[in-house]
């Protein structure tokens, strides 16, 4: 069962659960006035906890469709509930199933709705910010919509990796950054160097919002890579030779 966008269940979830969550945790929201009241946009948060997407769904006033692991839909209950909440299941093994999820995301955006995707591709178990994958940039170029970097701070402390239950009475900050507009690149929509440039700009903005240390590898590829300041990588993103050099050392995204 494929999600075709966030539905009424997410609206009800927000209405019922938000008052309860506000009693359990303290939320500090910044930059939410930057989000458009209508029209398509892509929200790209860092990912350090299972709670990241849930807290965004609670506090963003519009419904959001999010990509989620297909493994979550392993029972008849989750097969109904997660798509009704707006989850678009993606098979991380790649191939046609992964492409189907991105096609669904494109339809969501073309209907003028919000779509959320974690550019790191998976949760960061050590709290570092990892290299972003180019899916969000590719979608934004196809649809012509802005990308909003999102910084989520505190969810890792609320529910650390492998913790079954979240801790209460803790703080969570959610920051919406300045939109990244892709119109200036539309005539180079198929250029992977441009997609990489947009994605690096996105990860730099997320780093500015969260203060996380950055690692220049994809999440799960290497836990031993030295942290590299994002600024060192994107300071010359306009330099074509710099982009070509970075591409040469990157795995296909």
Segments predicted by a language model, with ranges:
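Non-catalytic C-terminal accessory region of glycerolipid acyltransferases
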Residues: 1-9, 99-253
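Short amphipathic alpha-helix with an adjacent loop that forms part of the alpha/beta core around
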Residues: 33-35, 106-107
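Short gly/ser/thr-rich secondary-structure transition/capping motifs
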Residues: 22-30, 97-99, 156-159
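A generic structural signal for well-ordered alpha-helical segments
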Residues: 20-22, 81-82, 108, 139-140
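Generic beta-structure capping elements
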Residues: 32, 46, 69, 93, ...
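Extreme N-terminal tail/first-helix region
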Residues: 1-23
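Catalytic core of membrane glycerolipid acyltransferases/transacylases, capturing the structured
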Residues: 15, 22-23, 35-97
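Conserved beta-strand scaffold positions in the cores of enzyme catalytic domains, especially
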Residues: 29, 66, 87-89, 147, ...
């Amino acid at each position: 069962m494929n999600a075709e966008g966030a539905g009424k269940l997410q609206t009800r979830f927000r209405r019922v659960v938000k008052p309860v969550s506000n009693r359990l945790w303290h939320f500090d929201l910044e930059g939410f006035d930057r989000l458009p009241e209508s029209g398509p946009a892509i929200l790209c948060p860092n990912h350090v906890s299972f709670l990241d997407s849930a807290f965004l769904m609670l506090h963003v006033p519009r419904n959001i469709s999010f990509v989620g692991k297909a493994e979550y839909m392993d029972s008849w209950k989750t097969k109904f509930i997660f798509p009704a909440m707006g989850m678009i299941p993606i098979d991380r093994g790649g191939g046609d199933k992964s492409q189907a999820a991105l096609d669904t995301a494109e339809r969501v955006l073309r209907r003028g709705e919000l779509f959320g995707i974690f550019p790191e591709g998976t949760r960061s178990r050590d709290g570092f910010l990892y290299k972003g994958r180019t899916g969000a940039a590719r979608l934004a170029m196809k649809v012509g919509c802005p990308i909003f970097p999102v910084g989520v701070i505190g969810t890792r402390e609320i529910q650390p990796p492998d913790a079954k239950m979240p801790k209460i009475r803790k703080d969570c900050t959610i920051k919406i950054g300045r939109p990244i507009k892709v119109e200036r690149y539309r005539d180079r929509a198929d250029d992977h160097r441009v997609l990489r440039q947009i994605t690096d700009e996105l990860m730099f903005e997320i780093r500015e919002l969260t203060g996380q240390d950055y690692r220049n590898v994809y999440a799960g590829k290497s836990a031993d890579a030295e942290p590299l300041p994002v600024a060192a990588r994107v300071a010359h993103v306009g330099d074509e030779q710099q982009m070509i050099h970075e591409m040469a050392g990157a795995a296909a995204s």
